[in-house]
A protein has these predicted regions:
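Sec-dependent signal peptide recognition
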Residues: 1-9
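Hydrophobic h-region of N-terminal signal peptides that target proteins for export
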Residues: 9-17
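Structural boundary/hinge residues at secondary-structure and domain interfaces
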Residues: 19-166, 171, 217-240, 278-314, ...
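One face of beta-strands
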Residues: 30-34, 93, 107-111, 246-250, ...
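Solvent-exposed coil/turn segments that connect beta secondary-structure elements
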Residues: 37-39, 112-116, 182-183, 190-192, ...
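A conserved glycine-rich beta-strand in the N-terminal activation segment of trypsin-fold
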Residues: 167-242
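Surface-exposed interaction/gating patches
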Residues: 219-275
Length: 362
């Protein structure tokens, strides 16, 4: 959990128009790809309301978990060592994964953020971080580099993902951080990083968002995050073949005062798409009944509030659309109301945590 919190800080970002999502460097053979863009000017993250919301959330979380008080110090430590401003609205990421038939997974992450390459190198050398090589590009052991940045990140580094290897196979390469230039970091195992770096230098063809998917992304207004899956690049199974599933796309965007989410799944035919449309619409129809609960049992104030929040959230979800071989789910939430919902959920969680029995200390 600590690692996830730290990584969330490191890759915080969001948006430009869909055509400006930068997939350069992402291998075209990845089954799953994702990207974000600059969040500059967005109400969800780069507005007075967003900053006030973030400050309130930080205060609430600090009361719940004292270790979160170290987040500012951690950000400052990262900036001092690398020059990276984690709160810059211009930070962006892109990447993806490919899946093997035996369950093995490989992939990479491209972090586009302004940083000081000389400062990063000097820090890594001073902290004796192990070096790695991706072709002609020098890098550092990701786990060791993370641990060297701050005490809080050193604790998180213990949960750093270790690439799995098959029994009897040679030890897998560690995940590295490779500094391509003052605006680009590549995070991947050395062999994969070398492939990504070649693509960034124009050697080969990178992934490109298919023109048929752009309308779904653009329909969110000003899109700031996209996630796409291509079933043809997934390991073949009879179940996948029978389903007719071809792929899916998820996009988040901002349109005026609203946050828009679109999820579309594509199938080989209208007939193959129909079961998914029916299942999705059925789940939406059942949701209010599930929220109603058992009228014979008394509800606590907390349960009533959580039900009200769930109902408010579901109110933003529109009926499922089925058009030919495509099934689409759309949701729309007012940005300020969304802030309010998230804040209430965290506050309820904090209240429950404080009321829970505390572990005995000697």
């Amino acid at each position: 959990m600590r690692l996830l919190s730290c990584l969330a800080l490191v890759i915080t970002s969001a948006v430009l128009p869909a055509q400006d999502f930068d997939f350069k460097g992402v291998p075209a053979d990845y089954a799953i790809v994702f990207a974000t863009a600059s969040s500059r000017g967005l109400k969800i993250s780069d507005s007075p309301e967003a900053k006030a919301f973030k400050a309130r959330m930080e205060k609430t979380l600090a009361g719940l978990d004292p270790s979160t008080k170290d987040s500012k110090e951690m950000q400052e430590a990262i900036k001092a060592a690398t020059g990276i401003d984690l709160e810059s609205p211009d930070n962006r990421i892109a990447g993806g994964v490919t899946l093997g038939a035996a369950g093995q997974m490989s992939g990479g992450l491209i972090v586009r953020t302004r940083h000081d390459s000389k400062k990063l190198s000097a820090h890594a050398v001073a902290k004796k971080v192990s070096t790695l090589q991706a072709g002609a590009t020098k890098g550092w052991n990701g786990q060791e580099l993370l641990a060297s940045l701050s005490d809080e990140l050193a604790k998180a580094a213990k949960d750093f993902p270790t690439p799995a290897t098959a029994p009897g196979a040679p030890a897998s390469e560690p995940i590295g951080v490779f500094d391509l230039d003052d605006n680009t970091l590549v995070i991947a195992q050395p062999k994969e990083a070398a492939r990504i770096i070649d693509l960034l230098k124009g050697k080969g063809t990178s992934y490109a968002l298919n023109a048929s998917l752009r309308p779904q992304v653009n329909a969110t207004g000003r899109p700031y995050a996209v996630f796409a899956m291509n079933a043809a690049k997934l390991p073949a199974t009879p179940e996948l073949s029978d389903s007719g599933f071809q792929g899916a796309i998820f996009a988040m965007g901002e349109n005026g005062s609203n946050q828009i989410m679109k999820i579309s799944a594509f199938f080989t035919s209208k007939e193959k798409a129909a079961p998914m449309a029916m299942q999705a619409q059925g789940m939406l129809a059942m949701a209010p009944m599930m929220l109603a609960g058992d009228p014979s049992k008394p509800e606590t104030a907390e349960e009533k509030e959580m039900k009200a929040l769930a109902a408010e959230f579901l109110a933003g979800v529109q009926p499922v659309e089925a058009a030919g071989n495509q099934v689409t789910l759309t949701a729309k939430w007012d940005t300020l109301k969304l802030f309010g919902m998230l804040e209430k959920i965290v506050a309820i969680g904090a209240t429950k945590a404080k009321a829970a029995p505390q572990p005995l200390t000697k």
